[in-house]
Amino acid sequence: MPMASWTLPYRVEAVDRDPGFYWQEIEDGHNNDGSADFFGQFINFDSEIPSSMADHHGHNPGMPTLADGLMLDHPSESTASASSGVSTTEDEFDLFSCSSQVDATVPSQPGSSAAPGASHDVDPRSLALADSSGLMVEKHSMVPRVSMSDPELPRVDGISLQSSPGRRVPVSQPSSPTPPNTMTRKPNKFVEALSSTIRKASKLRKPRKPIAMDRPGSPTMDNPPRALRLQHHEYNGNDVFPPSPTTCGPDSTNFVHGFCDDPFDEIPQQHPNNMRFFKTNGIHTPAESPGIKTEPGMYQPEMAGQAVWPHQQHPHPHPHPHHPQAHTHPHPHPHPHPHQQAVAGHPQHAVPVVGPAPETWPGHEYMAQNAHQSGWWDLNLLNQNGEYVVVDPQQQKNANLNLAMHAQHAELPYEYQVHDPNSAGLMIHMPQPRNDSTPAHDLALNAQTYLPPPPPIPPTTERHRPPRAPSSGARHLSCSPIRKTRQPSIPPTPTTVHSRHSSNGSVASARSASGRGMVPGTPTAMRKQRRSRDSSGGSVGDIGFVNFTPSDGGLLMTGVAPSGSSKTKARREREAMERRRRLSEAAMKAVQAAGGDVDKLMEQGFAF
């Protein structure tokens, strides 16, 4: 009866234990050597059981030796599985030591199938063997059974709490070469919590592994690199091109030249807006480039139905990774080809091409995705092979300009690749060309894409209405005709029209010049008169807009607003007039005091 109560917890727990439950993600899940065993530090591997586990309870010295047949009945079943990878080449006592100590931690694990009564806190000391003496009669009530009654539970808890490490140390020291068994049996709660945590983690990770295994290799690389490596056998028939060193597996047939936009692939498979570049060739010049292009998977909506280069006109409706032989250009995104759909609404879809298809171009990546977007290099220009590419002019007229240049920059993913030296670009935040295009193309393209010119001027015969204010000339410069084609502007300076400001200013300036002792004919006086006269020349005839020229500097500087110098000049003139008035009044008073006739003097022309 006591033997049954001993062995039953081992049997139940051992059968239910998963030998490789520690890390489900390890490829070699059946690692049976103790080096990968996490609980190795909590297990006593010594081969002398009676002395190493002798005195764990000082109160039961009369515990008889449990029969060797207890463990020799099923040594491999109860120990190889219960100790989770403990080597079975140890002797029988060592096996029993391992299993008896592991069993203290096993009942608390949540995945076990033991009865709930046996999964309470059971200290390893309550399961230890005594000194080869007899088995106590009450000992079997403290040993965990499959079913344990509630009154016995406090006794088990009491045993786990009243153990003293002082008795255990001197007996286990001489025969135990591994000191962790004296240190790690004390925190039983810690061992149980740790084992249950690992058990839960392994149960949570367990369903994730088959998902990564069963997932088909998608060109978007949603599966991790290891999952790609596990599926090597699925694509052996399709590996036309060798896998690139920068990619993770034979899915790299979709990435022919070893290009991987993002190893972690968080790029959404969204269809961005219509994105085109400004060009300086006019409004009917298409805007597409082999050097910098949209991602191959990001087809614009209006591209659907456009027949592209002749090498793409084969009739298989494909998500691309299953036909890598037919496509030498990578398609990192799964999509049914838009150019395989109906060509409704685009009658001018054919692109006449003279010479080989552009899959012979460097990089094998260029596709004229939109016939309306055949770029500036197609306008009677040579491609990289030195052959002309002709585009229907009707397609050029249908090309429209998308002013949202920032959308192109925002929706293109970054490149995590060392750029080719031939890709001559600024490399600021614009994704660089993926193929080995010529530097001349990239230089011209970067000049046009980084600094887009103003919108082209549509040809028209009527003149633009000029801006009403002189300061708005800079804003309307791109829309107004070139300055050289205008009629020579008539500056408002050489005018003879005098207003009241002009007359008053002239008299005042002449008076001030004479009052200061300056002859009116001197250059200073003439400059003052001309300056005061210029202030009135704002309205010349019926001109609604005055086009100022460099000769209008005097008018612009003096006639706009009174500056500090003009205010000072006016103040000095007022002061001089006040002095002259006071002087004349003083002279008149002096004449009157002398008895002279002031009126007679003024009649004779004497000016005070």
UniProtKB/Swiss-Prot annotation:
Q: Where is this region: Disordered?
A: 54-88, 102-125, 146-186, 202-226, 309-352, 447-544, 556-576
Stretches of Basic residues bias are at: 313-338
- What keywords tag this UniProt record? Activator, Conidiation, Sporulation, Transcription, Transcription regulation
Bias (Low complexity) occurs at 77-88, 107-119, 163-175, 339-350, 502-517
Q: Which residues form a coiled coil?
A: none
Q: What induces it?
A: Expression is positively regulated by flbD.
Deletion consequences: Results in abnormal production of conidiophores and conidia, including longer conidia with fewer septa, conidia sensitivity to acute stresses such as oxidative stress and heat stress, and vigorous generation of single-celled conidia through autophagy-dependent microcycle conidiation. Reduces the survival rate of aged conidia.
GO biological process, any: conidium formation
Per the entry, what this protein does is: AbaA and wetA are pivotal regulators of conidiophore development and conidium maturation. They act individually and together to regulate their own expression and that of numerous other sporulation-specific genes. Functions to maintain conidial dormancy by suppressing microcycle conidiation.
Q: Give the similarity note.
A: Belongs to the wetA family.
Q: What is this protein called?
A: Developmental regulatory protein wetA
UniProt source species? Gibberella zeae (strain ATCC MYA-4620 / CBS 123657 / FGSC 9075 / NRRL 31084 / PH-1)
